[in-house]
């Protein structure tokens, strides 16, 4: 059946991309973009799951559940939002990362994002998530024991 990997993201889209980025930010329409980099990423089978993949097998701390799953509330400000004026983009999602879709996304982030406030990756069988940061024009994994989701106190690993 396959395992899920989650991604939580908060960042600022570069000004030159802001006007045309809303369909991607809110609907995952990478392949419909006129920008070649976005289009090429959109050709990945699971690209639209970023940012639109619903959470599956992610830590309970990532959302407040509801009786009806579609009404669950994202926590910590990771609900899917995009502000065209400021470029602020937030989301959390999960997907089966068979083709390294998340890694492809992270590699592309420096192309269209000027600032990353939070980038976190969590594989459903891990105890701890990874923290990623934008450093010198590259996304770099800076902490492979970022948040421990196996303990009720939610401390660092």
Model-predicted regions and their roles:
Residues 27, 36-40, 44-157:
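Charged interaction segments
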Residues 1-35, 156:
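Short, extreme N-terminal segment that most often corresponds to the first beta-strand
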